[in-house]
Amino acid sequence: MANRAYKFRIYPNDEQKILFAKTFGCVRMVYNHWLDRKIRQYEENKTNVTYTICAKEMAAMKKTEEYRFLKEADSIALQQSLRHLDTAFQNFFKQPKTGFPRFKSKKRNKNSYSTVCINGNITLSNGYLKLPKIGQVRLKQHRIIPEEYSLRSVTVSQTPSGKYYASILFEYEDQVQEKELQKFLGLDFSMHELYRDSNGKEPAYPGFYRNAEKKLAREQRKLSKMQKGSNNCNKQRLKVAKLHEKVSNQRKDFLHKQSRQITNAYDCVCIEDLDMKAMLRSLNFGKTVSDNGWGMFTTFLKYKLEEQGKKLVKVGRFFASSQTCSVCGYKNAKTKDLALREWDCPQCGTHHDRDVNAAVNIRNEGMRLVNA
């Protein structure tokens, strides 16, 4: 079995908006309450409070006068919040680099909650999504869902600009057959053009955030000078949020189109396994890396390729793609200087464009890994 999610915009009425706000708040409160409980328990005797214990404590808490308001929220959404917390703790202890679970802030974190389909409590039909405690919510269904797809869960979210979305997860029987890999493409991450491929092509990435940076800074300055809580401040905050949302949507649209073009043309795409977090922390590269959305692009590539029985291959991040001559294999230590964009191989005399040569090496290494 395989999973696939579709994201649709939903249009709740005023009453449903209030119910969503209550659910967002309850889910956040449950997460923070038991995060604090887990921290104190661990500090006292180095033991963990399991999901089962947390769920029993929450059931008892709902019966008290102080926390009776939790009954107004979807009970499954509250349970899912506990599950997410439990998963976050397990991930931290398995791999500390993921970071310790943090308390959720009403201002810092986005409003969202997840609920699971049990006994038909969630349905999608005739342009409406039925949700527990919420009822029928109008939905803009821009694609047809195959009949064999089974609805498993829904994540409801609200953007800073006030729009509501439902990400619906479906389960279906995976019948994709792996294709014979004949056409290979290598991609080398490019700071300004997103990537250069092994054919020497680049996508001419527009740099949406960089283009909007001055306007964003101007509107952000206006917001910082306004009195917090005033009507004008709220209007300006919404304006800034919409600008950020526009940049995000432009980037996603571009990356979806680029990944689709590549997927349709090639059977196997080879990329470097880059440490994007380290690159984001770099003072010189942070904004550019974030604007490019390389991580998002590779995610799109991966699922699109897999849907067609194709492959995304990652070569090791320490593979010397830029230093190695793609013709004779000579390693040129001088290319460690990032300012060196073109070079001639001292051994075979081939003239190289740094990025294209790297992409060719990545493609060749990917082919070697596939055929090993």
Go through each PLM region and give its residues:
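Nucleic-acid substrate recognition interfaces
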Residues: M1-A372
